[in-house]
Design a protein with these regions (language model features):
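Extended amphipathic ligand-handling, pore-lining, and cofactor/metal-binding catalytic surfaces
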Residues: 1-195
Length: 195
């Protein structure tokens, strides 16, 4: 084997799991969880997470369009898993806001907003993020807007059930598909390998 490409199934580089794996592949000086053996070899080619790549933006816009009926009267919420630390969360939200800007500029949606759950952070942090999302949905509904929820989650069967439970009782439409299930994700991998 001349080259082995490592594709992390993560939508963002701003989390401790990605940092630990980067450490293992000798791309990060400090480990996140455990000081383990480092794989220092030119055979391994590490591909950065999809983040706000053009293909990620296109996929998420397609997922919003799939559940849209009248863009001018709809708001789109993009929900990310989110990291543990607040510093990483700031960086993650920059990525998410780039995606939101792309969707706004390539559609007629009334508004596009990004949120992170910080699903593995402390309960108080996660609860605060959920409350912010719920309040945004309530306010949008009171303004007569239809609320569409999409995500940059990788799979379609991860924390989506938790999101549905967290938003129970609110009026919204959720496209729970993940980036991995879209045919363009394979194109992104192929493009990343040839860069």
């Amino acid at each position: 084997i001349e080259s082995m490409y490592i594709v992390l199934i993560s939508s963002s580089p701003y989390n401790t799991i990605v940092r630990q794996l980067r450490y293992i592949f000798n791309l990060e000086k400090n480990y996140s969880y455990a000081d383990v053996d480092v794989l220092a070899s030119n055979t391994f080619k590490y591909i950065e997470p999809i983040s706000d790549d053009a293909i990620a933006k296109e996929i998420i816009l397609e997922y919003a369009n799939e559940i849209s009926t009248n863009q001018e009267n709809e708001v789109v919420i993009i929900i990310a898993h989110g990291p543990v630390s607040q510093a990483d969360n700031v960086q993650e939200l920059l990525i998410m806001n780039n995606i939101a800007d792309y969707i706004s500029n390539n559609s007629n949606f009334s508004e596009v907003r990004s949120f992170t759950l910080q699903d593995d952070a402390g309960k108080a942090i996660r609860d605060n993020n959920i409350n912010n999302i719920r309040q945004y949905i309530k306010n949008s509904s009171m303004q007569g807007k239809r609320v569409l929820v999409v995500s940059n989650l990788m799979s379609g069967k991860g924390i989506q059930k938790n999101i549905e439970k967290d938003l129970n009782g609110l009026n919204y439409t959720f496209n729970s598909k993940g980036l991995l299930t879209h045919p363009k994700f394979k194109i992104w991998i192929e493009d990343s390998i040839t860069k």
